[in-house]
């Protein structure tokens, strides 16, 4: 943080709270008197700038527990690293800029990737395996914007490609790249449907068969698939 913003890092004024149905004491509210477990379930985890605290879903039947059971505890670490990314934004003034939500979410994904990259390179107190990194990416994809949604809609987090791309930028290039994403954001993958037919196909390209003429193949898919694969693997 000092290298990126020229100031010392200030620890959270609040804390990191685990939310679960049986929790005996109330969770602090974010603009409300208290935070309910249902509120936390909706977001899986969130950072509250008003109280400078983080809450995450620690319920045994919650999505985070399900992902951790399937893919490992690395999912929890990367989700919390994303929320700490928002805490960084609070301290650096990014959250005061009234940016589109997806812009701040991209930077938070990038900071999570930078933290995971450090762990994967054994540069900190925590070490990550490839499986841990993969688990974190899966967790991000679980809360991606659905196909057809404009990423600039209120609350947009980015399509799956957007989230993975931001994570990768941080993982490979480090936190300095993340700091630049406000002025130099990553391009977003088109996520909206072009027309009604596109919506009916859920954004998938036509397979390339003309059902009106049996046996006659339309080369739409094959027309762009082969050049794309050659470009990727070339």
Give residue ranges: language-model regions.
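Short, structured motif recognition centered on aromatic/hydrophobic residues
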Residues: 1-4, 79, 106-116, 164-167, ...
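Short helix/loop segments within enzyme catalytic domains
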Residues: 5, 103-105, 109-146, 223
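Catalytic zinc-binding patch centered on the HExxH motif and its immediate surroundings
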Residues: 18-55
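Active-site-proximal beta-strand/loop segments in catalytic clefts of secreted hydrolases
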Residues: 20-21, 57-60, 79-82, 90-93
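Structural recognition of the beta-strand scaffold that forms the well-ordered cores
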Residues: 53-57, 87-89, 109-110, 114
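Short pre-active-site segment immediately N-terminal to the catalytic Zn-binding motif
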Residues: 60-78, 96-100
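Catalytic Zn2+-binding segment of zinc metalloproteases
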Residues: 83-99, 114-121
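Pan-zinc metallopeptidase signature
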Residues: 145-232
């Amino acid at each position: 943080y000092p290298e990126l913003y020229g100031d010392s890092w200030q620890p959270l004024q609040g804390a990191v709270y685990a939310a679960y149905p049986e929790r005996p004491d109330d969770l602090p509210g974010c603009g409300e008197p208290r935070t309910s477990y249902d509120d936390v379930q909706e977001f899986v985890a969130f950072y509250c700038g008003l109280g400078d605290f983080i809450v995450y879903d620690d319920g045994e039947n919650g999505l985070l527990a399900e992902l951790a059971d399937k893919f490992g505890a690395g999912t929890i670490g990367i989700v919390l690293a994303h929320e700490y990314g928002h805490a960084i934004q609070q301290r650096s003034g990014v959250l005061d800029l009234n940016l589109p939500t997806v812009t701040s979410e991209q930077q938070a994904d990038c900071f999570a990737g930078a933290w995971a990259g450090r762990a994967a390179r054994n540069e900190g107190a925590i070490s990550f395996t490839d499986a841990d990194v993969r688990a974190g990416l899966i967790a991000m994809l679980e809360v991606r914007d659905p196909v057809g949604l404009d990423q600039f809609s209120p609350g947009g987090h980015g399509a799956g490609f957007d989230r993975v791309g931001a994570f990768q930028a941080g993982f490979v290039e480090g936190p300095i790249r993340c700091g630049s994403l406000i002025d130099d954001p990553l391009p977003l993958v088109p996520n909206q449907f072009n027309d009604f037919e596109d919506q009916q196909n859920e954004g998938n390209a036509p397979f390339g068969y003309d059902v009106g003429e049996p046996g006659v193949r339309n080369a739409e898919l094959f027309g762009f698939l082969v050049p794309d694969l050659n470009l990727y693997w070339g």
